[in-house]
UniProtKB/Swiss-Prot annotation:
<keyword id="KW-0689">Ribosomal protein</keyword>
<dbReference type="InterPro" id="IPR001787">
    <property type="entry name" value="Ribosomal_bL21"/>
</dbReference>
<dbReference type="InterPro" id="IPR018258">
    <property type="entry name" value="Ribosomal_bL21_CS"/>
</dbReference>
<dbReference type="GO" id="GO:0005840">
    <property type="term" value="C:ribosome"/>
</dbReference>
<dbReference type="GO" id="GO:0005737">
    <property type="term" value="C:cytoplasm"/>
</dbReference>
<dbReference type="Pfam" id="PF00829">
    <property type="entry name" value="Ribosomal_L21p"/>
</dbReference>
<protein>
    <recommendedName>
        <fullName>Large ribosomal subunit protein bL21</fullName>
    </recommendedName>
</protein>
<dbReference type="InterPro" id="IPR036164">
    <property type="entry name" value="bL21-like_sf"/>
</dbReference>
<dbReference type="GO" id="GO:0006412">
    <property type="term" value="P:translation"/>
</dbReference>
<dbReference type="GO" id="GO:0003735">
    <property type="term" value="F:structural constituent of ribosome"/>
</dbReference>
<keyword id="KW-0694">RNA-binding</keyword>
<dbReference type="InterPro" id="IPR028909">
    <property type="entry name" value="bL21-like"/>
</dbReference>
<keyword id="KW-0687">Ribonucleoprotein</keyword>
<dbReference type="GO" id="GO:1990904">
    <property type="term" value="C:ribonucleoprotein complex"/>
</dbReference>
<dbReference type="GO" id="GO:0019843">
    <property type="term" value="F:rRNA binding"/>
</dbReference>
<keyword id="KW-0699">rRNA-binding</keyword>
<comment type="function">
    <text>This protein binds to 23S rRNA in the presence of protein L20.</text>
</comment>
Amino acid sequence: MHAIVVCGSKQYLVHENDTFFVEKLEAPVGKEIQLDKVLMLDEKIGAPYLEKARVVCVVEKHGLQRKVNVIKHISQKHHLKKYGHRQPYTKLKVVRFVHD
């Protein structure tokens, strides 16, 4: 089984017992969450979402992605600005698909 779900503003193709990374969610590690914005479940396609369809996931961990370094340089002004950014994420594991 597979599904396409919306979490945040992104779409993810997920399979059963699959792990995937989403933008940071405010949920403790080990908590079971339900993603109810399901665009597609197997061959059923929603308009835009499927009614009464959910993907049940467990929060495995929170973390930070690899650092992205940014350098801004203005030529002939002797100006150099350097900073970095690490985007937070949440790792989810799909437990089951529910469709009533």
